[in-house]
C-alpha cells in the first residue's frame, strides 16, 4: 500500500472528548471517527487491525471444531418474548416496529435466534454435539457510551453457541473453548487472565471471563501471587480469618455521635481504628418474606459485594438498597446509626465481622453508636456469609499465596448456559433412549472491537501505538527520504516494496512529499512494527537504517540483506 493511494487521516492533537489512551490514539492514528454517541466509522487503518483480530479468532474457532454461520442483526420480538428476556433485558434492548407494525429488536446477542434455528434443524442426539459461531454486528443501547469503541453502542462480536445432550459433552466443549480463547489472546500478544466469573444476565452455571490487564480497565481482576487462582472481584471468595475471635476487653457503651453519620466521620471524631468499626446496609427482602428488609454487615474498611449479597436466599433480586424512608419505617433510625444490637429484622454478617470483638456499630437510635460490642454477649451471632469484596493482601481461596488486584478489560466470556434457553424455546432432540431430551447449551463471546482498544491500552508509548506484530495494520513501513528528488532512493524504495510484497509481507510505502519528521511521526503513531529508512547518505555506504518500533533500537543493514532480514524478523 502507498500512502499516496491511502487514507492515512492522522491527527497531531488529541481530541478533547477522548478520555482513555486507546480512544485518543485510535482517533489520532486515523483508525476511527465518531458518527454519533457510541457509533464509529472504521477507517482503513482500523479495519486492517480489525481484520487481523477477526482472522485469528476465526482460525482458532475453526481449529476447535466450531462451525461458522451468520445470523440477522434484526430479530423478531416474539423470540425474545418466548425466552422471557423481552421483559428482563431492559432499555439496552433497542425495540422497534416495521411498516407492518410487527415488533423487532436490534440484536445485542443471539441466544434466541440460534436456539430457534436448532430446534427446527436438529432432531436426533446423533447430530450432536455442535458448536456454531459468527462474527457479527451487535447493538446495545448503552445509557452512557464512553471510552470510544471500548463501550460503544454498536460493536463487532464473535459469539458461539454449543448444543449437547449431556453435561459431560458441554464440559468438553467448554474446555475446548477455554483453550481456544487462551490461544487467541496469546497469539495477539496480550497479557490476560482467565478468571472465574458471575454469569450475570446471560444466566447459566459455570463462567469464565478473559481479562486484558490494563490501568484503564473497568473491572477488578483478582489473582494469587503464587498459584493459578484468578477470579473477578464479584466472584472472588473472601475466606474467613484463621485467627479465633479475640476475647472481649470492653463493656458495651452507648455513645452520643450526633455528627458521625459515616464510618469516616466516626473514625476521625473518635480516633477509632477503622478495623474496629462495622457498617450496616439494609436491602429489600425476597418477596413473600415476613420482613420487608434484611440487614447486611461488613467491616468498616470493607465493601459489600452486591453480587454475593444478591445470591443470599433472603435477599430480593435484583439487589435493591432500602431508602431512608423504608429504613425508618422498620428501624426507627436513619442510615448513619444502624447496627446489629436490637435490629428488628434478619441480619447477615460477613465472615470478617463474625471474627470481630470490641467493635463499634450504630445503636439503631439516631445520633448514637454502641462501642465495645461483642458477639454472643451483647447480641447473638447472626447468620454468617461471605458478602464482601476481597482486598489486596487477602489469603488466596485456594490456600496458596495472597491475592493481588489489578484493573482489567473484559474481552471474552464463556458460559455454561445449561437448559435456560432450550427449555424456554422448547429445543429438544430424540435421545438415545428414544425419549425427547431438552438440549444443554454453552455460550462463548469475544468482543472483537474491544480487543483492538484493549491491545492499545497495553501497548503504547509517548509517540503512539506499539502494536503486537500479529495485529499490526502493516508489518513494514518504508520511509524514502527525498525520494522525489533522488532517483536512487526512489528506485530502491520501489524495488524493496515489490520484493517484500512478493514475500507476503504487508508494506506501507510512504511516498508523500512530506518532511521526514512528519513521516517518522505518522509511522510511530500508527505503530508499524518494522521501519526501514532509505537516505542518500546511508546508501553511499550501501546501508539501510532499520528500526524496531517496540524497543526503538536502530541498526544499519546492508542493502542486499534487508529483505532477508525482514522476512526472518517477521516470519521467524
Curated annotation (Swiss-Prot):
* Chemical reaction(s) catalysed: tRNA(Pro) + L-proline + ATP = L-prolyl-tRNA(Pro) + AMP + diphosphate
**Family matches, as SUPFAM superfamilies:** Class II aaRS ABD-related, Class II aaRS and biotin synthetases, YbaK/ProRS associated domain
Q: Which CDD domains match?
A: ProRS-INS (cd04334), ProRS_anticodon_short (cd00861), ProRS_core_prok (cd00779)
One GO BP annotation of this record: prolyl-tRNA aminoacylation
Q: Which domain of life is it from?
A: Bacteria
Record's keyword terms, sorted: Aminoacyl-tRNA synthetase, ATP-binding, Cytoplasm, Ligase, Nucleotide-binding, Protein biosynthesis
Gene3D superfamilies in the record, alphabetically?
A: Anticodon-binding domain, Bira Bifunctional Protein, Domain 2, YbaK/aminoacyl-tRNA synthetase-associated domain
State its location(s): Cytoplasm
Q: Name one GO molecular function term.
A: ATP binding
Q: Which InterPro entries match?
A: aa-tRNA-synt_IIb, aa-tRNA-synth_II, aa-tRNA-synth_II/BPL/LPL, Anticodon-bd, Anticodon-bd_dom_sf, Pro-tRNA-ligase_IIa, Pro-tRNA-synth_IIa_bac-type, Pro-tRNA-Synthase_IIa_type1
Q: Gene Ontology terms, cellular component aspect?
A: cytosol
Report the EC number(s), separated by commas if there are several. Answer: 6.1.1.15
Report the principal subcellular site.
cytoplasm
Tell me the protein family, please. Belongs to the class-II aminoacyl-tRNA synthetase family. ProS type 1 subfamily.
Q: Any idea what job this protein has?
A: Catalyzes the attachment of proline to tRNA(Pro) in a two-step reaction: proline is first activated by ATP to form Pro-AMP and then transferred to the acceptor end of tRNA(Pro). As ProRS can inadvertently accommodate and process non-cognate amino acids such as alanine and cysteine, to avoid such errors it has two additional distinct editing activities against alanine. One activity is designated as 'pretransfer' editing and involves the tRNA(Pro)-independent hydrolysis of activated Ala-AMP.
The protein's matches in HAMAP family, at most eight in alphabetical order, are given as: Pro_tRNA_synth_type1
UniProt free text on domains: Consists of three domains: the N-terminal catalytic domain, the editing domain and the C-terminal anticodon-binding domain.
Listed name of the protein: Proline--tRNA ligase
Q: Which organism is it from?
A: Escherichia coli O157:H7
Amino acid at each position: 500500500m502507498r500512502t499516496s493511494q491511502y487514507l492515512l487521516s492522522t491527527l497531531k492533537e488529541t481530541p478533547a472528548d477522548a478520555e482513555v489512551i486507546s480512544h485518543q490514539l485510535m482517533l489520532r492514528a486515523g483508525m476511527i471517527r465518531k458518527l454519533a454517541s457510541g457509533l464509529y466509522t472504521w477507517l482503513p487503518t482500523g479495519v486492517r487491525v480489525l481484520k487481523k483480530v477477526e482472522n485469528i479468532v476465526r482460525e482458532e474457532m475453526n481449529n476447535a471444531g466450531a462451525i461458522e454461520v451468520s445470523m440477522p442483526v434484526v430479530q423478531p420480538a416474539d423470540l425474545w418474548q418466548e425466552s422471557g428476556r423481552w421483559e428482563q433485558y431492559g432499555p439496552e434492548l433497542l425495540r422497534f416496529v416495521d411498516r407492518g407494525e410487527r415488533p423487532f429488536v436490534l440484536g445485542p446477542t443471539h441466544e434466541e435466534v440460534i436456539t430457534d434455528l436448532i430446534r427446527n434443524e436438529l432432531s436426533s442426539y446423533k447430530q450432536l454435539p455442535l458448536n456454531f459461531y459468527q462474527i457479527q454486528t451487535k447493538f446495545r443501547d448503552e445509557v452512557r457510551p464512553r471510552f470510544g469503541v471500548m463501550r460503544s453502542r454498536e460493536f463487532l462480536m464473535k459469539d458461539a453457541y454449543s448444543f449437547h445432550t449431556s453435561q459431560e459433552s458441554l464440559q468438553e466443549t467448554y474446555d475446548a473453548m477455554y483453550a481456544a480463547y487462551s490461544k487467541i489472546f496469546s497469539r495477539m500478544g496480550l497479557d490476560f487472565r482467565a478468571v472465574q466469573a458471575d454469569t450475570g444476565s446471560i444466566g447459566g452455571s459455570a463462567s469464565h471471563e478473559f481479562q486484558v490487564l490494563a490501568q484503564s480497565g473497568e473491572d477488578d481482576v483478582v489473582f494469587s501471587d503464587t498459584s493459578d487462582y484468578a477470579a473477578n472481584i464479584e466472584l472472588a471468595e473472601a475466606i474467613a480469618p484463621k485467627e479465633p475471635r479475640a476475647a472481649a476487653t470492653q463493656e458495651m457503651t452507648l455513645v452520643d455521635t450526633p455528627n458521625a453519620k459515616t464510618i469516616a466521620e466516626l473514625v476521625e471524631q473518635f480516633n477509632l481504628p477503622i478495623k474496629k468499626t462495622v457498617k450496616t446496609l439494609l436491602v429489600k427482602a425476597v418477596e413473600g418474606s415476613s420482613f420487608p428488609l434484611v440487614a447486611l454487615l461488613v467491616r468498616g474498611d470493607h465493601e459489600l459485594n452486591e453480587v454475593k449479597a444478591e445470591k443470599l436466599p433472603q435477599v430480593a433480586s435484583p439487589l435493591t438498597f432500602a431508602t431512608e424512608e423504608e429504613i425508618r419505617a422498620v428501624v426507627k433510625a436513619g442510615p448513619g446509626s444502624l447496627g446489629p444490637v436490637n435490629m428488628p429484622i434478619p441480619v447477615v454478617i460477613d465472615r470478617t465481622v463474625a471474627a470481630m470483638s470490641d467493635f463499634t456499630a450504630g445503636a439503631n437510635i439516631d445520633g448514637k453508636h454502641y462501642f465495645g460490642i461483642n458477639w454472643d454477649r451483647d447480641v447473638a451471632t447472626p447468620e454468617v456469609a461471605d458478602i464482601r469484596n476481597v482486598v489486596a493482601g487477602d489469603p488466596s481461596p485456594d490456600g496458596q499465596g495472597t491475592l493481588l488486584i489489578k484493573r482489567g478489560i473484559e474481552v471474552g466470556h464463556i458460559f455454561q448456559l445449561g437448559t435456560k434457553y432450550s427449555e424456554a424455546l422448547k429445543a429438544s432432540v430424540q435421545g438415545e433412549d428414544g425419549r425427547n431430551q431438552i438440549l444443554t447449551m454453552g455460550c462463548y463471546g469475544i468482543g472483537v472491537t474491544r480487543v483492538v482498544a484493549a491491545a492499545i491500552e497495553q501497548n503504547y508509548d509517548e509517540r503512539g501505538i506499539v502494536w503486537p506484530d500479529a495485529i499490526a495494520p502493516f508489518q513494514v513501513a518504508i520511509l524514502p527520504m527525498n525520494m522525489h528528488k533522488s532517483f536512487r532512493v526512489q528506485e530502491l524504495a520501489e524495488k524493496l516494496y515489490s520484493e517484500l510484497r512478493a514475500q507476503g509481507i504487508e508494506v506501507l510505502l510512504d511516498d508523500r512529499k512530506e518532511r521526514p519528521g512528519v513521516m517518522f511521526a505518522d509511522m510511530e503513531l500508527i505503530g508499524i512494527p518494522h521501519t526501514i529508512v532509505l537516505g542518500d547518505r546511508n546508501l553511499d555506504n550501501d546501508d539501510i537504517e532499520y528500526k524496531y518500533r517496540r524497543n526503538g533500537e536502530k541498526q544499519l543493514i546492508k542493502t542486499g540483506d534487508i529483505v532477508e532480514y525482514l522476512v526472518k524478523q517477521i516470519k521467524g
